[in-house]
């Protein structure tokens, strides 16, 4: 389906991020391409170390890209210096994985939520700042009685609500959700996911939702990108990816999801065996080759390097 460029809030072209190590360059993000429509969610899923969090941080320029282009809301921001990026910080935000380690333990809830409002001069008077801070607490479902509490006095769910309120404080268009529920109990996870979905509906937010949990990403995402060793190996709508996975790595990930067994039918699991290729000085071949039976049988004649369906 063709798309109007005005519908695209973020386009990433051949994004790379390499880190120097004593043994050579570590390919954390290597040639990533995608687009996101306004008001939708792109889920990025993969094993630990695949580069999904680095992708999110590089898009926000919390770490500088090695190469490629980042086009946000029609502007190429790739070469923006810190001063120019500062103005964009009110349009792009992040929710971190661990709400405890990402919050200053010396600050109260009032101080934590009001900090972005003060930092970006969104409100000037103390009364305005206090009023908006309380409004943000209401928005994320954090009772006002906790306004003078400190992070260590709250449970994980309430701490994550503080993180969400901080992200919302600048009234962003795009939020990178970096494993926002992985540190929470399952019952609390559902509450936070429902909150994020409601906020998206009410405020028209666009999310990049980073996770290793396939059941969560299916529930939460419009499109899903699967990453392996710095590359997006497959991208499709949520339904397409789960109903008809194409890349062998995607098939193996989906096969590992525990499902209830009905009657005597039992789903055959595709176990991933073999050693993970080192991300340092990667050869120019399929990175899943050492762990993929399909690749071993057909390489080099037919190798699944990247499969993209959907918005590109």
Range-by-range predicted roles:
Residues 150-154, 158:
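Conserved ABC ATPase signature
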